[in-house]
Curated annotation (Swiss-Prot):
A cellular component term, taken from the record's GO annotations: ribonucleoprotein complex
Listed name of the protein: Heterogeneous nuclear ribonucleoprotein H2
Annotated region described as 2 X 19 AA perfect repeats, given as residue ranges: 354-392
Dimethylated arginine found at: 233
Gene responsible for this protein: Hnrnph2
The entry's keywords: Acetylation, Isopeptide bond, Methylation, Nucleus, Phosphoprotein, Repeat, Ribonucleoprotein, RNA-binding, Ubl conjugation
Gene3D superfamilies linked: 3.30.70.330
SUPFAM superfamilies hit by this protein: RNA-binding domain, RBD (SSF54928)
Repeat positions for Sequence: 234-249, 354-372, 374-392, 418-433
């Protein structure tokens, strides 16, 4: 007997907006009027590549009638979150589950975990003791530092096998000292992607039009402080930073190969290209589709930010740490696509706890990653389109809304096209800057080459 189209595709719904701590049992209670195939095994959560819950799941049901019942739960609440329910199918479910999460082809079986929330001054020996009985590979521990040589509170640890790494994950939320430690699945690819700053950071470029001479960290200045020394030690070491006491695990972070250690020490990430002189961000985008946040509560966590953008699913959140080691109230949030980044801008001026948060778009249609410049603008932002080589700048125009083409002082025939939002900025009156920006962009891209 031929199966119907519905039978071949299965009876599946996709759920979005789940609380991060949600369990399969809670999903079953949410769909208590529906018959779920195989009980809790019919609830298939979607995870990020770092092993964090994405807030989404697929639910396999027993019939088309059960799917219709499940769809009636759309926009109902679970805890303090409203949950969206969409019709899906087994083809979509299988593809998504195969290509996402820490067990996707490019992240599986390398035994990495990422630790977050380490106490200030936490040593390698304390981490080894924390994972007592679990074998860590030689040179398999990395303690990233900021540009002043201070610990970021994170660590990457590579275990002797994926099975041992799975055991390590069970220590999630256990304590080192007075701090509870969060543990996520990771991978060699994540380590390199997260902390490999572009080589342009080794060059001294001339200042951009918005660099501030008195800003301290403007003009791409690089100081040879403790961070530089720690980088130098790690970058010349073998593996993931040199070997020292304990059988070693150097503090440095370098995958070392060429004269500066091809994948530079993490401390260089903190010395980002402040061409517009406005930030202390160590964030390096991998997709080119980001939103910068300003005005965050000082106690805001990554999970608070993920919740803030729900039901959108950011790929990565980076909370900025200032030179004094304290949070700055700013963060960079990376999205998979330009469309997601634009949709996230709907949250501009929304509240997080008692603070309203300003958002600034750092994304260009057609950009597929790479380095980019950004300037923060008040009240609104216009995003330039068609940037080449992944490098672009964000410019301000004279009206409200978002436009995907803009120019400082272009000719009168300059046209606006395809803007996002309800309004369009007027013709820029900031003549005289266009040539500077073009020269600066040319110089910037030549350095990237």
């Amino acid at each position: 007997m031929m199966l119907s189209t519905e039978g071949r595709e299965g009876f599946v719904v996709k759920v979005r907006g789940l609380p991060w701590s949600c369990s399969a049992e809670e999903v079953m209670r949410f769909f208590s009027d529906c018959k779920i195939q195989n009980g809790t095994s019919g609830v298939r959560f979607i995870y990020t590549r770092e092993g964090r819950p994405s807030g989404e799941a697929f639910v396999e049901l027993e019939s088309e009638d059960e799917v219709k019942l499940a769809l009636k739960k759309d926009r109902e609440t679970m805890g303090h979150r409203y949950v969206e329910v969409f019709k899906s199918n087994s083809v979509e479910m299988d593809w998504v589950l195969k290509h996402t999460g820490p067990n996707s082809p490019d992240t599986a079986n390398d035994g990495f975990v990422r630790l977050r929330g380490l106490p200030f001054g936490c040593s390698k020996e304390e981490i080894v003791q924390f994972f007592s009985g679990l074998e860590i590979v030689p040179n398999g521990m990395t303690l990233p530092v900021d540009f002043q040589g201070r610990s970021t509170g994170e660590a990457f640890v590579q275990f002797a096998s994926q099975e041992i790494a799975e055991k390590a994950l069970k220590k999630h939320k256990e304590r080192i000292g007075h701090r509870y430690i969060e543990i996520f699945k990771s991978s060699r690819a994540e380590v390199r992607t997260h902390y490999d700053p572009p080589r342009k950071l080794m060059t001294m470029q001339r200042p951009g039009p918005y660099d501030r001479p008195g800003a301290g960290r403007g003009y791409n200045s690089i100081g040879r402080g403790a961070g530089f020394e720690r980088m130098r030690r790690g970058a010349y070491g073998g593996g993931y930073g040199g070997y020292d006491d304990y059988g070693g695990y150097n503090d440095g972070y370098g995958f070392g190969s060429d004269r500066f250690g091809r994948d530079l020490n993490y401390c260089f990430s903190g010395m980002s290209d402040h061409r517009y002189g406005d930030g202390g961000s160590s964030f390096q985008s991998t997709t080119g589709h980001c939103v910068h946040m300003r005005g965050l509560p000082y106690r805001a966590t990554e999970n608070d930010i993920y919740n803030f953008f729900s039901p959108l699913n950011p790929m990565r959140v980076h909370i900025e740490i200032g030179p004094d080691g304290r949070v700055t109230g700013e963060a960079d949030v990376e999205f998979a696509t330009h469309e997601d980044a634009v949709a996230a801008m709907a949250k501009d001026k929304a509240n997080m706890q008692h603070r309203y948060v300003e958002l600034f778009l750092n994304s260009t249609a057609g950009t597929s990653g790479g380095a980019y410049d950004h300037s923060y603008v008040e009240l609104f932002l216009n995003s330039t389109a068609g940037a080449s080589g992944g490098a672009y700048g964000s410019q301000m125009m004279g009206g409200m809304g978002l436009s995907n083409q803009s120019s400082y002082g272009g000719p009168a025939s300059q046209q606006l096209s395809g803007g996002y939002g309800g309004g369009y900025g007027g013709q820029s009156s900031m003549s005289g800057y266009d040539q500077v920006l073009q020269e600066n962009s040319s110089d910037y891209q030549s350095n990237l080459a």
